Amino acid sequence: MTESVPSQPHQPKPQGRPETDDAPDDRAPALLLSGARLGDGRVVDVRLSGGRIEAVGTAGSLAAPDATGGTRVDLAGYLLLPAPAEPHAHLDSALTADCPGPPSEAQQDVQRRVTEAALLQLGHGATALRTHVRVGDLRGLTALEAVLESRRALRGLVELTAVAMPRVLTGMAGAEGLAVLRDAVKTGAGVVGGYPDLDPDPTGYVEAVLGVAAEFGCAVDLHTEGGDPARLARLAAMAGGLRPGVTIGPCTGLAALPREAAERAAARLAAAGISVACLPQGGCGALAGSASSGYAPGVARLLRAAGVRVTAGGGALRDAANPVGRGDPLEAAFLLASYGECGAQAAYEAVSGRAREVLGLPEVRVEAGFPAELLAVRGQRIDAVLSLGYSRIVIHRGRVVSRTSAVREYADCATTAALDLPRQSRSGGTPA
């Protein structure tokens, strides 16, 4: 294999208000990733510079970084992948499952939770996160301001986007909610959303959100169980063709519909270009306690078959809706594959490439010219790393921003000695 020549990858033209500042960092020092295995089985060297992939060549073919501060990272035994992204988080309520009473909504406490949860998800591999934030009522914009402070503090480590979620947008209380939503966008929310199912007039709620999105050029991300075919049809008719795009989820209610009705609803969503964020780990703070707040196996498969862009998120992260939520995109992919929604490769694509599309971020491939947003996981194949990929190296904007190392050792045993089994997991074999 010869060294690849940098090219200009196709990138979608930015439309409307940008969610994040995801431009490559021209100041990032050169970095050589040596001996990494790619998804197609090749073992390669990858040189990064200026926040992008500069070159990809056969292992040992690329020169080490020069003396200007560049470094070399040995990735022998690691699978190198485009980094995941988190399309559906609730960081403002994360890590509150063990609170003895209602979690504090003081800005400093929310900021601490958001920052800790974002770093936790970064450690799992997600270099971009979209978090839903409640605005209005008594809390005003406090939680949003905390998220925006965390975004500034985490700049250079992970990209963080806020979705503003007002409670009510119709009726007597709707005027205040609409004003708060506009203020949220002006303050820094990159996406508008909410949960129309909980409004007295769900259709009116959607109309209000779409109006604000059109006014400010924002993307839309709405919570819905998706159990009402007529309501989904109206949403598809209203939102179809909106740029920069509409995402809904988790849509678990589709599983309760007759098969033909669910297929028709999925076809309408596909025709309208609406994406769906599933939550295979279950639990979502916005819909906590509802009849279909868990995960419904088969929904993602049905949507994919209809041509809907399906991504998968973590949802609740150790809060009241899911006290054991992990926020790990590899676990989300593992569950998609385990439920039979798709194969391992497509499952990983749902939390990486499809997730980046939903977030409006540039495509990532392990090829010259693409953004250096990468995840190295110890293992040889995608199915193995989804099952046992604990050791991870995360690269954002061309530099290593997180490392997690796991070593598994076994005590002496006559059987393992007789079979010549390792006491410690092999670096190039069984993942750790």
Where are these regions (language model features)?
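His/Asp/Glu-enriched, well-ordered alpha-helical/loop segment
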Residues: 240-244, 297-377
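Active-site metal-binding motif and surrounding structural segment of the metallo-beta-lactamase
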Residues: 62-81
